[in-house]
Amino acid sequence: MLLKHYLKLHTLPRIEGASIFSSRNNVDLLFHDQTIKVSRKRTDGNFWKIFDFRFLKGRPLTADDEKNSNYVAVINESTQKKLFGNKNPLGAFIELEGQPFRIVGVVPDVPALCDRPFADVWVPLSTAKTKAYLKDGVFGDFNAVVLAQNRADIPLIKKEYSERLQRLDYPVPEPWTYAKGRMETYLEIGARSTLNKKGYLDKTYANKFRIILLIGVFIFILLPTINLININLSRILERSSEIGVRRAFGASTRVLVVQFIVENVLLTLIGGILAFGLSWGILQVFNTVDIIPYKNLRFNFLIFFFGFAITILFGVISGVYPAWKISRLHPVAALRQGAM
């Protein structure tokens, strides 16, 4: 395996650990007279140290399990319920592609959106039917992940990986003449995939992706703000008579502006509360629809708080200009405009 034996990922500086694991494969699982389709993933022992699994029962796969080719397996909660109901599955044997595995652990379902750790059943790498995965090759059915000690160490780790790749003494098969690759964060992987730059591994597209997202969010917020300004201006113009009377009795521009801004913020608060309830309801309904396996969409109150704060800010902005403009009208002009 190129990553493990030639690049020696586990010796990279300032990392907590490195793991190599297979892509997931859909296979038949047999248990007594039951047969179900499951996603299987082969892992090493470090896989369970890098990804944050919570064990409901039993233990994870270990380095010894991989070294000794122990036929043991970890299953998810849904697979346990399908096969065992409320019974304890630890110690029971299941069959995958003709191979018997003893269940040693149970974990909560991993959402399919978490592509790297996701599976229904996890077994040791070394239990593969053939040892072809140990042979040298450029392409394979495996992934690698590295856990940095600190976020600040990521650039150093990437640099060391790139330097090792350049010094690589590896027989690159024809027609290729060199090996090319990079270590990427989830954001960088998503950015390159979204921007259709899958073959461009010489640079990162994360910053470009961030800028595009920020521009999109800005436009998404700006357009409703412009609409709100127009709506507020029309609404306030309808109250020209009221404004004219209040100005005639000595109401200052500041008092009128504050009044209309407060009214606008209150309306925004009501809209935000309605949006909160609607969003929560949609999430509950979406969680009951079996579109994404094992999804568990939860309401993120921190994101909602920031979104709500931005909404209030733009609510204030959309109320300032109309309120300031109408409050500057002469009382007589305001009364005439209201009478028209």
Regions found by a protein language model. Name each.
Residues 288-294:
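Membrane-interface helix termini and inter-helical loops of multi-pass transporters
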Residues 222, 226, 233, 241-287, ...:
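Transmembrane alpha-helical interface segments in multi-pass membrane proteins
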Residues 211, 255, 299-307:
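Residue-level signature of transmembrane alpha-helical entry/exit and packing/kink sites
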Residues 202-241:
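Hydrophobic alpha-helical transmembrane segments of multi-pass inner-membrane transport and secretion
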Residues 302-340:
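C-terminal membrane-exit region of the final transmembrane helix in multipass inner-membrane proteins
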Residues 1-88, 96-101, 288:
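Structured, solvent-exposed hinge/loop segments at the ends of secondary-structure elements
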Residues 1, 9, 15-18, 48, ...:
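Generic structural signal for small/hydrophobic residues in well-ordered secondary structure
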Residues 46-60, 71-201:
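Mid-to-C-terminal secondary-structure elements
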